[in-house]
Amino acid sequence: MARVAGVDIPGNKRVEIGLTYICGIGPTRSRHALTAAGISFDTRVKDLTDDQLVALRAHIQNSYRIEGDLRREVASDIRRKVEIGCYQGLRHRRGLPVNGQRTRTNARSSKGPRRTVAGKKKAR
């Protein structure tokens, strides 16, 4: 098990997949980082040499905003939008979808479970 950017990456996974355990690194960034570090995509994490791990860690730390920094930046962006009172900030404050999705039906994930209203029945 290797540790990159404060995250334990399972040793039995391919490096390409293992790097996606880090917040802020998806499949595409993973491939870019491996290419820059000169590591094959098919290599298993347990088979990486110390030199390869050092090169990979250095590239990821210097090139990408990941883990705590990324989470902090996203949280501050949301906080700023809420404070200035823009439309997206209002949607965040109310716990509704932010990016223009419909809410007449669906949006249950953000709205939470249904609250039944007493005395409201469907007209026939």
UniProtKB/Swiss-Prot annotation:
Polar residues biased stretches: 100-109
Recorded GO MF terms: rRNA binding; structural constituent of ribosome; tRNA binding
Pfam families in UniProt: Ribosomal_S13 (PF00416)
GO biological process per UniProt: translation
A GO-annotated cellular component: small ribosomal subunit
UniProt entry keywords in alphabetical sequence: Ribonucleoprotein, Ribosomal protein, RNA-binding, rRNA-binding, tRNA-binding
Record's compositionally biased regions (Basic residues): 111-124
Protein origin, superkingdom: Bacteria
Disordered, as annotated region: 95-124
Subunit structure: Part of the 30S ribosomal subunit. Forms a loose heterodimer with protein S19. Forms two bridges to the 50S subunit in the 70S ribosome.
Family from the record: Belongs to the universal ribosomal protein uS13 family.
PANTHER family cross-referenced by the UniProt entry: 30S RIBOSOMAL PROTEIN S13/40S RIBOSOMAL PROTEIN S18 (PTHR10871), SMALL RIBOSOMAL SUBUNIT PROTEIN US13M (PTHR10871:SF1)
Role summary: Located at the top of the head of the 30S subunit, it contacts several helices of the 16S rRNA. In the 70S ribosome it contacts the 23S rRNA (bridge B1a) and protein L5 of the 50S subunit (bridge B1b), connecting the 2 subunits; these bridges are implicated in subunit movement. Contacts the tRNAs in the A and P-sites.
Stated name of the protein: Small ribosomal subunit protein uS13
